[in-house]
């Protein structure tokens, strides 16, 4: 641009004449020529700006001159063009190039009469700048060209590798690796742009009042990160939390969220390594903070009920613990030591790897899932809609829900045939998923049956039923028991019902039918909670029921297991007859009550293990030809165990003469108590024949050890010698 073109642009907006140094600047910063201002004042007797109609209170002579115009005209007349490379040079800035020209040109040393403002070097201390490390010429039109050692003014940072800067009035971009930053650019505020609308106030105003409501394309100022999925932000004068996936953060906000996320993950990892239980308690307490504990002002924002509402698994009443997914940990159901350690919390079935941990006994999961769910006993009603994913499922439609193996699901209802609608406890998302991909955590009606049709096997029909084993809460534990913290509640214990293959039909069949009725009523009622007193006669049914792995706590004359016989830690032998009962220290009473049999023991904790699968080993000693038929139950031993456990059930062929005994009314609810214990024993002898029971502790017997059990009964017969190589042998009279 030449000087003539520049002078043509400098004209008065009123008369369109060329401006000169006599032009005046009004208080509104508009510039007009002096003759135009005089004509306006003469015509209207006052001076107002022709552009904005601003009133001028001083005279025309008192108005200042336009300093920029004076400098431009001075530069044009002196032959120095003020336009360099198409960029207008700022006033009051003296570059290094101007300094060189001033020293080399003697003409510039003479003061100009029109130069009113001195050129002063700009203060560079607070200006973001960088020093060039090498020559850069650039290949694209927008690249900035500079030489080594040049000082470049930084305008903004495009990304981690590129800057936009200015040198000698020329702006462009250049790589960050070619310069050394002397003064960093001020960091932009951490902002994020909303990608979707977010509003939860209509759902639950009381619990979602701490959520930050925004619309799409709103700009939110990020304050801090709350957890992996939530951040705290400010929009206008409102402060709240919002989901991170709903916004797009800028560079500063991304760095802030990433640094906070790393700190949260590191803190959580250290807390879990140091104290898992304390970390879980701290996490739960932080999730359940009341809204009143939130800090006031724009400082740190504590996570309150809004985050708790979206991340919690179920709605629990006040004062109750929340259901939470604990760290997975598999406990072998065949290890009695582990079961003894966790005996205070729950009973573990052998076919399940689920863990139930609570302060009071709670039902364990009957399924084969590896999901670990901690449910307090006060919230057993939540088991109806709690499910665990058996397999991983990828969603094929937007309304479907992704499932991870072992993930907890809260089922909200049935969507259609084969599909359920539920809430993921891991992600908090709601959707539909196939029903065959999940399994309920608890189910009071779930039963898994498996039958062995081979008649030669030790068990003709083995049925796994989810039976209900309960202990009367009216009694008390033994004194000094450290585990006595509260009354027992009904727990689920899988039991194996072994029916003998050669039991002859007779009175026993009706007894088994009544047993099935009682068992069905037990399942309906949920538990057997009636007190049992010592000395009440009982009756043994022709079936052996035992739990493969079961932990039983003692209770003084109140233990009432429906599984039948349970061994005691010390050898016990009971002989039914007119003689006195000979037992070990833990008293065991076998008495008669009409047509039902129970064995009540007040011994210490009992662990009984056994599996119904037979193992191939040397056959047991065969009884003589004259001996009555018997069934040998030989459970499979554990892999690491060296002891063998043999159970023999022998049924006598002869039937003793029936005797009269008092029968109680089934509907009266009262039991007939015998006058003396001897009378009860005498009735048991007359009705049940002779019966010898041997309980051998697993660690108390060795292979080859024999116990002489030859004792005379009331009938004057001698029992044969029984070998007890870690065995439990029971002889029952046939029905």
UniProtKB/Swiss-Prot annotation:
Q: Does the keyword Chloroplast apply?
A: no
Note down the stretches annotated as region Disordered: 262-302, 333-378, 497-534, 612-720
Catalytic activity reads: S-ubiquitinyl-[E2 ubiquitin-conjugating enzyme]-L-cysteine + [acceptor protein]-L-lysine = [E2 ubiquitin-conjugating enzyme]-L-cysteine + N(6)-ubiquitinyl-[acceptor protein]-L-lysine
Locations of Low complexity compositional bias? 357-366
Report biased composition (Polar residues) as residue ranges.
272-288, 367-378, 523-534
Q: How is it modified after translation?
A: Autoubiquitinated.
- Cite the Pfam families for this sequence: SH3_1, SH3_2, zf-RING_2
For this protein, the Enzyme Commission number is 2.3.2.27
Phosphoserine, modified sites:
655
An example GO CC term for this entry is: nucleoplasm
InterPro entries, per database record: Endophilin_SH3RF (IPR050384), SH3-like_dom_sf (IPR036028), SH3_domain (IPR001452), SH3RF2_RING-HC_Zfn (IPR028511), SH3RF2_SH3_1 (IPR035792), SH3RF2_SH3_2 (IPR035794), SH3RF2_SH3_3 (IPR035822), Znf_RING (IPR001841)
The protein's location, in the record's own words, is: Nucleus
Known pathway: Protein modification; protein ubiquitination
Question: Where are the stretches annotated Interaction with PAK4?
Answer: 372-465
User: What does the sequence similarity comment in the record state about its family?
Assistant: Belongs to the SH3RF family.
What this protein is reported to do is described as: Has E3 ubiquitin-protein ligase activity. Acts as an anti-apoptotic regulator of the JNK pathway by ubiquitinating and promoting the degradation of SH3RF1, a scaffold protein that is required for pro-apoptotic JNK activation. Facilitates TNF-alpha-mediated recruitment of adapter proteins TRADD and RIPK1 to TNFRSF1A and regulates PAK4 protein stability via inhibition of its ubiquitin-mediated proteasomal degradation. Inhibits PPP1CA phosphatase activity.
Q: What is known of its domains?
A: The RING finger domain is required for ubiquitin ligase activity and autoubiquitination.
Name of the molecule in the record: E3 ubiquitin-protein ligase SH3RF2
């Amino acid at each position: 641009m030449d000087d003539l073109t520049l002078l043509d642009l400098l004209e008065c907006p009123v008369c369109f004449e060329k401006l000169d140094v006599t032009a005046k600047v009004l208080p509104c910063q508009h510039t007009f020529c002096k003759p135009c201002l005089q004509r306006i004042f003469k015509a209207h007797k006052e001076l107002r700006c022709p552009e904005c109609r601003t009133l001028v209170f001083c005279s025309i002579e008192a108005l200042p001159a336009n300093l920029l115009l004076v400098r431009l005209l001075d530069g044009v007349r002196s032959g120095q063009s003020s336009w360099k490379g198409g960029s207008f040079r700022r006033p009051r800035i003296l570059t290094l190039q101007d300094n060189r020209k001033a020293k080399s040109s003697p003409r510039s040393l003479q003061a100009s009469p029109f130069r009113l403002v001195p050129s002063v070097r700009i203060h560079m201390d607070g200006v973001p700048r960088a020093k060039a490390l090498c020559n850069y010429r650039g290949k694209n039109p927008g690249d900035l060209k500079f030489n080594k050692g040049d000082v470049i003014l930084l305008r903004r940072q495009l990304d981690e590798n590129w800057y936009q800067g200015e040198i000698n009035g020329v702006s462009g971009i250049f790589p960050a690796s070619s310069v050394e930053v002397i003064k960093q650019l001020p960091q932009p505020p951490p902002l994020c742009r909303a990608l979707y609308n977010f509003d939860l106030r209509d759902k639950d105003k009381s619990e979602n009042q701490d959520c930050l409501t925004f619309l799409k394309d709103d700009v939110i100022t990020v304050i801090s990160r709350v957890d992996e999925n939530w951040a705290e932000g400010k929009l206008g004068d409102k402060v709240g939390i919002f989901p991170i996936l709903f916004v797009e953060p800028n560079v500063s906000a991304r760095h802030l969220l990433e640094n906070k996320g790393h700190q949260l993950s590191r803190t959580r990892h250290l807390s879990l390594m140091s104290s898992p239980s304390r970390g879980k308690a701290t996490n739960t307490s932080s999730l359940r903070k009341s809204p009143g504990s939130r800090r006031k002002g724009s400082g740190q924002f504590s996570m309150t009920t809004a985050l708790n509402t979206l991340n919690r698994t179920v709605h629990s009443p006040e004062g109750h613990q929340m259901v939470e997914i604990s760290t997975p940990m598999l406990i072998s159901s065949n290890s009695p030591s582990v079961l003894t350690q966790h005996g205070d919390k729950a009973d573990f079935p052998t076919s399940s790897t689920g863990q139930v941990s609570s302060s009071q006994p709670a039902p364990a999961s009957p399924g084969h899932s590896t999901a670990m769910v901690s449910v307090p006993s006060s919230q057993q009603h939540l088991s109806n809609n709690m499910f665990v994913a058996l397999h991983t499922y990828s969603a094929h439609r937007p309304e479907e829900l992704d499932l991870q193996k072992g993930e907890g699901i809260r089922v909200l209802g049935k969507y259609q045939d084969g599909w359920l609608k539920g809430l993921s406890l891991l992600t908090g998302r709601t959707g539909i998923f196939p029903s065959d991909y999940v399994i309920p955590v608890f189910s009071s009606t779930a039963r898994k049956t498996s039958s062995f049709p081979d008649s030669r096997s030790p068990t003709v029909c083995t049925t796994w039923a989810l039976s209900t084993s309960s202990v009367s809460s009216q009694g008390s534990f033994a004194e000094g028991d450290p585990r006595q913290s509260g009354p027992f509640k009904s727990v689920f214990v899988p039991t194996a019902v072994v029916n003998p293959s050669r039991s002859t039909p007779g009175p026993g069949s009706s007894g088994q039918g009544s047993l099935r009725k009682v068992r069905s009523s037990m399942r309906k009622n949920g538990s057997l909670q009636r007190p049992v007193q010592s000395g009440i006669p009982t009756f043994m049914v022709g079936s052996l029921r035992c739990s493969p792995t079961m932990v039983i706590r003692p209770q003084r004359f109140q233990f009432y297991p429906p599984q039948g016989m349970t061994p005691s830690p010390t050898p016990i032998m009971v002989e039914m007859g007119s003689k006195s009962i000979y037992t070990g220290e833990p008293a065991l009473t076998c008495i008669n009550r009409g047509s039902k049999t129970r064995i009540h023991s007040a011994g210490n904790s009992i662990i009984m293990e056994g599996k119904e699968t037979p193992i191939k080993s040397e056959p047991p000693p065969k009884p003589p030809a004259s001996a009555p038929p018997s069934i040998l139950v030989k459970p499979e031993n554990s892999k690491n165990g060296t002891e063998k456990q043999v159970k023999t059930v022998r049924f006598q062929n002869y039937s003793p003469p029936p005797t009269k005994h008092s029968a109680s009314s089934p509907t009266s609810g009262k039991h007939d108590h015998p006058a003396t214990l001897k009378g009860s024993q005498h009735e048991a002898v007359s009705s049940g024949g002779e019966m010898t029971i041997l309980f051998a502790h697993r660690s108390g017997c060795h292979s080859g050890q024999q116990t002489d059990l030859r004792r005379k009964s009331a009938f004057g017969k001698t029992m044969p010698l029984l070998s007890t190589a870690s065995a439990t042998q029971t002889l029952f009279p046939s029905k």
